[in-house]
Design a protein with these regions (language model features):
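Non-core capping and flanking segments associated with repeat-based/extracellular domains
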Residues: 1-263
Length: 263
């Protein structure tokens, strides 16, 4: 029995090509786009990419997660000191999820290059999720933030964490909040080491959650203007709280706030 003939996808009308692309998972689309300049240009022309979501994670290993129309693809970049493993790829399927591991000497650099290509193919300027543990790649935090500043117009939901209390990430936190635009949600779960910590807090968020908010005193609270505000471990006194509530009720301050929780 002779092998099947290659399917001439590029000879199809564009609408038919687009239907073929809709049946592909995001990795298949990216792999197709890498074949030639022509396939790359065709890959960038699809009209349904607005339904795709792109998420970035920097925890134990950097990750790019792509939510397609049917499948969710996660690409992990795993640091390796084994020369034989450098560049190797492992893929596993689990239901709707496709897990892709890429072994690299410099996972952050590879993660950046792969992300730029993903953004180009799917014609994205903003990303849906950024989740970052600031104590994982401390020496590269500034480089990562500068990269995001140059390549991402905005982030819809951002979560920042600190796993090692002994590592001071105050400056990195402030630098990220000064340079990355956050549209909808900010979750901040880190320890504060400096009394003068005073980062920019985005305005008009749908939700602001700060789990160690000792640095947010009364005057700073008056500046917060988000729809839902949750502040844990907060030092505001009962007297200040009562004054704030009175101002809030008569709409003298924080007019966008609909829900406020202090602990």
């Amino acid at each position: 029995m002779s092998p099947p003939k290659p399917f001439p996808i590029l000879r199809l009308p564009f609408l038919a090509i687009e239907e073929v692309f809709k049946a592909m998972d995001p990795i298949e689309i990216i792999n197709f786009s890498m074949i030639s300049k022509r396939t790359k240009e065709i890959g960038k022309r699809m009209s349904f990419y607005s339904n795709y979501a792109i998420e970035l994670y920097v925890h134990e290993m950097p990750e790019i997660r792509l939510h397609g129309t049917k499948d969710v693809v996660s690409s992990f970049y795993v640091m390796t000191s084994d020369k034989e493993m450098d560049g190797k790829i492992e893929e596993k399927e689990w239901g709707r999820y496709i897990i892709r591991k890429v072994f690299k000497y410099d996972p952050i650099d590879e993660w950046k290059q792969w992300f730029k290509y993903v953004m180009e193919i799917f014609r994205k300027q903003a990303i849906d999720v950024l989740t970052m543990t600031l104590t994982t790649f401390v020496d590269q935090n500034v480089s990562i933030i500068d990269f995001l500043k140059s390549n991402v117009k905005s982030v819809d939901r951002c979560s920042l964490y600190q796993r090692d209390e002994q590592i001071n990430v105050d400056k990195h936190t402030a630098y990220l909040l000064d340079n990355v635009k956050i549209n909808s949600e900010l979750c901040y779960d880190a320890y504060i080491n400096n009394d003068d910590f005073n980062p920019k807090i985005p305005k008009s968020l749908q939700e602001l959650r700060i789990y160690n908010s000792k640095w947010i005193e009364y005057e700073r609270l008056l500046e917060i203007d988000c729809k839902s505000v949750i502040l844990k471990n907060n030092p505001i006194s009962n007297k200040e709280w009562n004054v704030f509530v009175k101002k809030w009720r008569v709409m003298e301050t924080n007019q966008n706030v609909e829900y406020l929780e202090l602990d």
